[in-house]
Design a protein with these regions (language model features):
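Helix-start/capping segments and mature chain N-termini
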Residues: 1-79, 97, 103-282
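Ordered, amphipathic secondary-structure segments that act as subunit-interaction surfaces
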Residues: 83-95
């Protein structure tokens, strides 16, 4: 069964997992959908404006026509949150899809763009840590895929990386670019710490520069902690003092095992999580 879900579509709120698209809908057929993911937890929804702005930017990248302003998205999110019990932990997903194909079927027709906003009950993972390994799959580049958008068509690559890692007994995996440089985890951005310095892969056009990632970097630097964006290899993570992840699923989480090496949640991870929670409630 689906958790409690509310969706705003065609001018009204509807409950449940709604069948909104048809068998000829372009985004279902040829993958032209975009979305974003924000969070509401403990009564707050940090950086909601940035998530709403990003879904509109993603739509333009994918040749869709965004028709909802950031302010309208935010207002609808607040309406949707009010439909749940107070302090319910929610996943917030604005989405654009193309209904019809454009010339020669392959591109979408921008004028057929439709949108919806879905909120659903989705508890965040407890900060108990998770295991990672190295994925054999690679991140695409900007000249091979629309990696500058949060597009649904990108996620099967992440999914196969996750499936492969789980088949080997790991929770997640580091995915590299075609040059062998670390890009991200299968579903989140990744950080490491060495000798008191936080280090994270520099955005190089192969992965999404996450909103939570950017926020954590700003918070750590404002707290006087050195954060370096750099080109990293897998061996750097194998030798790290700490590894942690940022993303919308659970915000800031520690990695407690890389391959067969155990790690403990360290002071820099803990500080990053503390700072983020303080910011969210500020």
């Amino acid at each position: 069964d689906w958790s409690q879900t509310w969706t705003y579509f065609d001018g009204e709120w509807r409950e449940g997992n709604l069948p909104l698209w048809g068998v000829r809908t372009h985004s279902i057929w040829l993958g032209s959908s975009v979305f974003d993911g924000a969070r509401a937890f403990e009564g707050v929804a940090p950086d909601l404006d940035l998530h709403c702005a990003r879904v509109n930017a993603s739509a333009k990248t994918m040749f869709l026509k965004p028709t909802v302003t950031v302010e309208q998205w935010i207002g609808l999110v607040r309406e949707g949150m009010a439909r749940f019990p107070e302090n319910t932990t929610l996943y917030i997903r604005p989405m654009y899809c193309a209904e019809r194909p454009g010339p020669q079927a392959l591109p979408p027709d921008p004028e057929s763009t439709r949108w919806c906003l879905t909120l659903y009950d989705a508890p965040m993972r407890k900060p108990e840590g998770f295991s990672i390994t190295l994925s054999p799959f690679k991140r695409p580049t900007l000249d091979t895929a629309p990696v500058d958008a949060k597009a649904g068509c990108l996620y099967p690559n992440n999914a196969r990386a996750m499936f492969e890692a789980k088949a080997r007994g790991f929770d997640n995996c580091i995915v590299c670019d075609f040059l062998g440089n670390v890009a991200e985890l299968a579903n989140s951005n990744v950080f490491m710490a060495k000798d008191g310095v936080v280090i994270t892969p520099i955005p190089n056009g192969t992965f999404l520069n996450g909103i939570t990632r950017q926020r954590v970097i700003k918070l750590l630097r404002a707290d006087g902690i050195a954060v370096v964006e750099s080109t990293l290899r897998y061996r750097d993570f194998e030798n790290a003092d700490e590894i942690f992840a940022t993303g919308n699923a659970s915000k800031v989480l520690p990695v407690t095992r890389i391959d067969e090496r155990s790690l403990q949640p360290g002071p820099l991870y803990r500080r990053a999580r503390e700072l983020y929670w303080a910011y969210a409630h500020g």
